[in-house]
Every structure is written in structure tokens, then in C-alpha cells.
């Protein structure tokens, strides 16, 4: 399955210590891929436990503008799988709707949007009110205009009125509007994510790796205590 978008996963603990340590995870991903990445950035549940996302990138236009730094890896992976089930025309419709700003408040919203694209009509390549007017009049024949009147007809004005009535939006890929269909909330939260889409898991450490990890935590804790003790000693002097 090809990648739709990617996220730069960063070790939060090391970031707070002044070190930027992270790697890119491509979605959809597998548990093994997630565990391998987490192990490489020392997020193993012992040394460090928390992550955040520094940046997003991908082929779905505008998607990363609506994703945050503390998104759930499992939820992102589920979104990627839902998008993978769409054909290219529906991906373009999805891009147009999110460009309009509808249902973009969270990954939860984006998942539901991707599962309700039949609530929207999308006309690819229509980027102006005049072009919209021509589609409605010349192709869809929504208004009976005599042939001898067509050369003088104000397609732009008609398209403007149509857009206002539709509540439509010109996106980079075309014209989109809600056709009156009611969005059905099919995704309610993390409990709706299928087991095969849940990938976040700390890497499995063997005994030697566990011992080394615990020792590193002990050493780091001792070092932090020493750093805190030094300023106090100076103040006493």
C-alpha cells in the first residue's frame, strides 16, 4: 500500500533536554514499522515514553494544515487507511472540502468526512463563477436559454448566484458544495479503530536491552539530581 502522508515523529523527552531526535513514519504503517522507528529514537517505554510530531507532509493537498503535533499515531493510521480506500476522484473531492474548511477541526472530523463524501458534489477544474455558470447552463441545462441569446448571456452573474445558493467553494482542484446530504458520524473515537489499524506499541526489548535502558534511566536521574544540587551548594556558600 502506497504512502499517503508522513509525519516526523520526535522524542519529546530528548527535545525537552535540548536534543531533536526523530524520524519519519509513512502512513499507512504497520506495528513493526512503528516499533522499529520508536526504538531508533529511544522511545522504548523505559528510556523515554512520550513523542510529538514535528511536521507533516504528503500527497493529499492541504491535509497536513489540519493536523497537530500531538495527534494519535493510531488515529492517523486509521485516517490513512480510510483515505486509501478512496479512488482518485474522491481524494480530489476530499481535498476540495477540506480546503473549504468543513469538518477539519480534528482527525476525528477528517475520518468522518472521508466516509461521507457522497454529501458533496464536486466539479473538477471549475475555478470561476463564469466557468460554473457555463457548466450549469451549457452542460447541465439548468436554465433554458435560447441559442440566439447564449452569446449575450451573463454566465458569470448566473454562476455567482448559483455559488451563493449552493453555498459552494472554489478550491484549487475545482468547485465543491454540500448537496444537502446529512453527514453520518461513523467514527466516534479510538474505540472504533480496527485492531489491524492500531500500530502504536513500544518496541520489545530483550533482557540485555532492558538492563541497559534501566541503567541509562538511573544514570540520567542521578545526573539531574547532581545538577539540582550544585546551585543549592553555591547559594549556601
Predicted features and spans:
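N-terminal ordered "arm"
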Residues: 1-47
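Short, surface-exposed beta-strand/loop "edge" segments at domain boundaries and coil↔beta transitions
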Residues: 14-19, 59-63, 182-186
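Acidic, low-complexity, intrinsically disordered interaction modules
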Residues: 134, 140-172, 187
Amino acid at each position: 500500500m502506497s504512502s499517503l502522508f508522513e509525519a516526523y515523529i520526535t522524542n519529546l523527552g530528548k527535545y525537552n533536554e535540548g536534543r531533536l531526535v526523530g524520524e519519519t513514519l509513512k502512513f499507512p504503517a504497520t506495528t513493526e514499522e512503528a516499533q522499529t522507528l520508536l526504538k531508533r529514537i529511544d522511545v522504548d517505554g523505559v528510556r523515554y515514553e512520550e513523542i510529538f510530531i514535528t511536521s507533516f507532509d504528503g500527497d493529499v493537498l492541504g491535509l497536513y494544515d489540519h493536523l497537530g503535533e500531538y495527534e494519535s499515531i493510531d488515529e492517523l493510521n486509521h485516517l490513512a487507511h480510510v483515505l486509501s480506500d478512496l479512488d482518485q476522484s474522491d481524494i480530489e473531492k476530499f481535498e476540495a472540502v477540506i480546503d473549504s474548511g468543513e469538518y477539519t477541526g480534528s482527525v476525528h472530523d477528517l475520518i468522518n468526512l472521508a466516509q461521507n463524501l457522497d454529501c458533496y458534489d464536486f466539479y473538477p477544474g471549475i475555478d470561476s463563477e463564469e466557468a460554473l455558470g457555463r457548466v450549469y447552463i451549457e452542460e447541465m441545462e439548468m436554465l433554458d436559454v435560447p441559442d440566439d441569446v447564449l452569446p449575450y448571456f451573463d454566465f458569470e452573474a448566473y454562476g455567482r448566484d448559483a455559488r451563493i445558493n449552493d453555498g459552494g467553494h472554489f478550491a484549487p482542484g475545482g468547485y465543491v458544495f454540500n448537496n444537502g446530504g446529512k453527514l453520518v458520524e461513523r467514527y466516534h473515537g479510538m474505540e472504533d479503530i480496527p485492531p489491524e489499524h492500531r500500530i502504536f506499541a513500544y518496541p520489545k526489548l530483550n533482557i540485555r536491552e532492558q538492563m541497559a535502558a534501566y541503567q541509562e534511566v538511573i544514570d540520567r536521574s542521578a545526573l539531574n539530581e547532581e545538577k539540582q544540587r550544585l546551585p543549592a551548594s553555591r547559594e549556601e556558600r
